[in-house]
Amino acid sequence: MESKYVLSTEKESKTKPSGRVNVSDMDSISNSLSKTSLGTRKVPTSLKTDASRSGLSSGGSKTHISDESALRMVYGSTPRDEKTTTTKDSITLAKEKEKKIEKRNEEIKLTFKAIRASECVDLLFIVDCTGSMDPYIEQIKSDIVKLQEALKLKHSFLDIEFGFIRYTDFDVASNRCSTFQFSRSTVEFVRFVSEIRAGGGADGPEDVFGGMDLIKSMKWRPNSTRVVIHIADAPCHGTEYHSMADSYPGGDPNGIKLDDLLTDIISLNINYYFGHINLKETGQMIDFFDKKTKEISRNKKSINSFDSKETSKMNERIFISIEESISVSRSVLTEQYLGHNIDGSTGKQRSEREFEINTNMDIDFGELPYIQMLQTKFKMPSDIVTCLSSSYEMKLNEITISIKIAPNPFSHGACRLAYLGIDEHGKKVVLKQSKYIGGRENSKKRYFESMECQTVAAKFALEFNKQLSLTSSEHQITFTVAKVLQMKHSEKPMYFGIETFINGEYQKYNSNCGWLKDDAMSEILQTFSHWTYQESKNKAIVVDIQGVKTSKGYLLTDPAIHSTDTLRFGSCNLGKPGIIKFFQSHKCNQHCKKLGLTIPSFTSSSSTSSSSRSTSSSSSISYSY
């Protein structure tokens, strides 16, 4: 964390008056008010009083009000000779909004460009092909087509090439290593792997460095998502990496250095995954590689690992690794295309916070201090269609609470860090913070957008549960209550998202760019997404469904909402193109039929029309994006 926590010794009121906020206008309220100095206008006494009560004056408690509300307060009681100015300001605001919409629509186009680019994947297998590895070589060969098909189902723009590096050990005098250059042909890939005969390996360690040294000789495509899957059951030579008998205890006999290998991997922007078969033998090496990679890259890269001992589960692990890599690439490319690598508030290059992941969830919070936070929570809207209006103001409540936060995050995604914490009642919570330093990423609006999205999704879920009239509670859909914390008494504003800790196996059921999990357990959640579009009168759809299956149903978090109002719900709102991507993949199921849901038909010139269907809609939906 770049700012120190500051504890308050002051006794303060825990509750704040409730207020309202139009989240999409939060970036314009300060600009609008700064253009209108209350001190230079003829402000009636009654208006000054209202401003003071609402936090517009320099003193008193503050509540959050929207741009629209603020302008009403400032201009509502102005003298007759100032009405012309007010009209001009309204016209200016309308023009500014038009520009914002145009800009956002262009950003959505660039986001889809990033999605397409991220699905250009170069997948390289590096495999120990000594005597004990036959079952794993065979598994890769038999799974490669299934892997490709599974990826195609999730990524409509997939363009994947496969490569292979085979290595053995120094007792194999000739042909110790060999390569298969990247190719789209699974037939050629299978032919190469079929000709491999496992052999060699007189001592325990193998020529790992020799295999890794060939990575730079592969013909990586420019800007591709680059993934290395390294499968091995033995470490490299050099006693600092293991405790086995070693014919080359001083390390690689050809003088290959680990730092050079890892520098190549980092400079090539490779996502490296080590599939260990015998962690007892390779664990020390993997940990050493990971630590050194983080050191050289300044925590921008790491060596990931997974258990590949069971050959039947290996393909699933590889699939997940590729998924993670595509997600990271998509985020990076989106930033590049949109220019978000420059912090909008400072004009400086965006930089990551310094952090170290600690996956230990058994934390002793006893010695950690409580930190005072201002907690903001939105009230659930009373009506779905109304809350989707561009002028809708979310009702909010504020309260001062105390939280203990773990010093290190336990997980991270493409954009956020996740910290474990406990509240003043001893309840486990998760605090989420931007990975990046800077005003754009850490603005109150950014956090409020996420909270608004989850609150509106929760309203959809509540109404969905009522309409479905399910007899079993196992299908009930619930979103955790999202809140925003602002650290009190810190030098600079510091925000966190906060939710109840979800205990269980976390799953993703669909994404915000068209992928849907195709299994029986996720059917009800795909129906939920479909239903939200119809229930909103074709204005919005809740996607990016993820969370935990519990005995009471589905407990979900971090949704996205695609809305025809592209200024709402943050950067994950991909507007009408995002809605279309869902229906290109969605297949109606028994739950859709029970609710009488219909598949919309999209054209570039019309909004939506409906036609019933129970199979894929990709052939009937067309829209230019």
From Swiss-Prot:
GO biological process assignments: contractile vacuole discharge; contractile vacuole organization; hypotonic response; mitotic cytokinesis; myosin II filament organization; regulation of sorocarp development; sorocarp morphogenesis
Molecular function terms, GO-annotated: ATP binding; calmodulin binding; protein kinase activity; protein serine kinase activity; protein serine/threonine kinase activity
Stated regulation of activity: Autophosphorylation activity enhanced by calcium/calmodulin.
Domain spans labelled Alpha-type protein kinase: 386-600
Record has Nucleotide-binding as a keyword: yes
GO CC terms, sorted: contractile vacuolar membrane; contractile vacuole; cytoplasm; cytosol; perinuclear region of cytoplasm
Post-translational modification: Autophosphorylated, in vitro.
Record-annotated membrane-spanning stretches: none
Localization per Swiss-Prot or TrEMBL: Cytoplasm, Cytosol; Cytoplasm, Perinuclear region; Contractile vacuole membrane
InterPro entries: a-kinase_dom, Kinase-like_dom_sf, Thr-specific_kinase-like, vWFA_dom_sf
Region annotated Disordered, chain positions: 1-64, 602-625
UniProt biased composition (Polar residues): 25-39, 46-63
Residue ranges, compositional bias (Basic and acidic residues): 1-15
Keywords, comma-separated and alphabetical: ATP-binding, Coiled coil, Cytoplasm, Kinase, Membrane, Nucleotide-binding, Phosphoprotein, Serine/threonine-protein kinase, Transferase, Vacuole
Keyword tRNA processing: no
Protein family (similarity comment): Belongs to the protein kinase superfamily. Alpha-type protein kinase family. ALPK subfamily.
Record's protein name: Alpha-protein kinase vwkA
Organism from which the protein derives: Dictyostelium discoideum
